[in-house]
Amino acid sequence: MSNSLKDLMNFIPQKGKVEWIGLRPAKRAELTAVHAVEIDVEEGLKDDHYSGKSRKRQVTLILKEHLEAVAKLLGKETIDPQWTRRNIVVSGINLTALKQKQFQIGEVILETTGDCHPCSRMEENLGPGGYNAMRGHGGITAKVIQGGQLKLGDEVVLKSW
């Protein structure tokens, strides 16, 4: 393998794993943890409040390892994934390395569309300092390229053509 920056940025041997899936049943409602979800190219996550509203932000993902970092920054033992308002928690793969790339989770193919920046709700959900603790740890947004079922334990891999 070449050591050019382009080659290094396109080589992601790690495989991640889906640790948690959450759906928002209504605006400002708590996320509901589920074992599996159907994902559609046009609608995004079925039964999610944001379903069909934004093609660039159909799915939000965050790293389990970042939840652990945020918890430490806030002096907490753990952070409940639903407090971050993200749909999917994954572990074992650097989501930032997936920027501008397509990746596969189970049957589903997603494409990163940007960073998922924290909002003011983080102060409300995580407590004082929650917004700043989440900065740089908010995960990514993605659009759906190929729909299907996504479930707990599914592997997360860079899509190779």
Question: Across the structure, where does each feature detected by a protein language model lie?
Answer:
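Metal-cofactor-dependent catalytic cores
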Residues: 1-161
